[in-house]
């Protein structure tokens, strides 16, 4: 039985995959979706194992990707990103476009989300591997103190710059501490 997208577009699954593979921007968008699916898998496991009370995914423009409820009752807003292509392991925290008349609107406000979950798949080939950073520990934009800096290095050594965590549970523990 064909997938709904095959029926909708009149293409085979192979043709759809080939179309994605040939288009850079479409692949970038797909990688973002892949990262979100892998992160949601982690949330499902955390909920099933009993160290996360609940979570909700959001697919709404202008909203963070997930809201997580901890066992202690804390609510954590999570934004999922992928690392940038290139030799440096870093994440870019800015929106695709700025609003007309407000160049600072392209940058994330420090209150937009609490935690960033960065998929490491482009660097490691493992799309289920993440690093987690607390927004309150990330540097601010040099021109707009209420906005986040755009580029953030993710060091291998946790002693460099803001703390980055390789385990989601460690990031939650640090957030609620």
Predicted feature residues:
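Interdomain/boundary linker segments immediately adjacent to catalytic/signaling cores
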Residues: 1-47, 54
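Conserved catalytic cores of phosphodiester-cleaving nucleases, focusing on short active-site segments
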Residues: 43, 66-68, 74-86
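Secondary-structure boundary elements
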Residues: 44-50, 71-73, 124
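Active-site metal-binding core of divalent-cation-utilizing nuclease and nuclease-like domains
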Residues: 54-72
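Catalytic cores of nucleic-acid endonucleases
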Residues: 80-130
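Non-catalytic C-terminal interaction segments of nucleic acid-processing enzymes
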Residues: 123, 128, 133-177
